[in-house]
């Protein structure tokens, strides 16, 4: 049988499937066909501020989630609160496991890397990731840094090609950064936060579609957050 195109192959497979289905009642066979709706989005919400509902970064990240929910078919929203469940600090034993090739993991490895493996799966399943963080001393929160240290791993979030170049494994994801700072950005103030997160996600995970939103001046007298104004140019991942 000569098949000249993919369309012909698909047509033949469908015909064979329909013939098989017709004979299923005679053979007392039942078939369940599951169709995945790829328009449904999974969202991962990372909260890293210790200020709970008083947090402006959490308020901004939640506003982003609301915008996404309005313009997308949401399948699932997973919330990873790094204050309620603090990521474990890397120690000598866990670092040794991090540097193992994934094919060398044993039962003890999986136990020691249980948190790391869990958050890797959360990121892997997410179509969109919303990360909320305050700016502390020009940088990200300690809990977010610890989460990143647990997440990033050779052989898991990135691999190497034959030339030794890193290849990120999570390229088709959209990330929104929701950043809150007590002061305001000026030309003289360095950005060690958004730039750092973008570089880490690009280099060690292959994620290049990263958009940062800032709520600034939160310590000023009479400050009131206007998240709609901050998000006035917001576009969801299926619109950008």
Roles of regions detected by a PLM:
Residues 36-133, 138-146, 229-240:
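N-terminal beta1-alpha1-beta2 submodule of the flavodoxin-like/Rossmannoid cofactor-binding fold
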Residues 49-51, 181-185, 217-220:
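A short, flexible beta-alpha/helix-coil linker loop
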Residues 187-240:
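Glycine-rich phosphate/pyrophosphate-binding loop and the adjoining helix
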């Amino acid at each position: 049988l000569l098949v000249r195109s993919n369309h012909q192959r698909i047509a033949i497979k469908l015909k064979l499937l329909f013939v098989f289905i017709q004979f299923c009642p005679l053979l007392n066979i039942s078939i369940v066909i599951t169709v995945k709706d790829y328009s449904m989005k999974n969202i991962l919400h990372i909260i890293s501020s210790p200020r709970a509902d008083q947090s402006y970064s959490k308020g901004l990240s939640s506003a982003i989630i609301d915008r996404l929910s309005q313009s997308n078919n949401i399948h699932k929203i997973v919330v990873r609160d790094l204050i309620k469940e603090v990521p474990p600090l890397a120690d000598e034993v866990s670092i040794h496991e991090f540097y193992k090739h994934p094919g060398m993991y044993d039962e003890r490895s999986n136990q020691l890397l249980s948190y790391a493996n869990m958050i890797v799966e959360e990121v892997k399943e997410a179509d969109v990731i919303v990360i909320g963080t305050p700016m502390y001393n020009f940088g990200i929160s300690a809990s977010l840094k610890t989460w990143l240290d647990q997440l990033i791993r050779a052989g898991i979030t990135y691999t190497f090609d034959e030339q030794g170049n890193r290849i990120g494994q999570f390229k088709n994801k959209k990330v929104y950064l929701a950043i809150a700072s007590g002061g305001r950005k000026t030309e003289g103030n360095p950005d060690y936060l958004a730039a750092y997160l973008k570089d880490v996600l690009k280099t060690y995970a292959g994620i290049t579609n990263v958009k940062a939103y800032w709520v600034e001046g939160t310590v000023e007298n009479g400050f009131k957050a206007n998240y709609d104004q901050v998000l006035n140019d917001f576009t969801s991942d299926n619109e950008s």
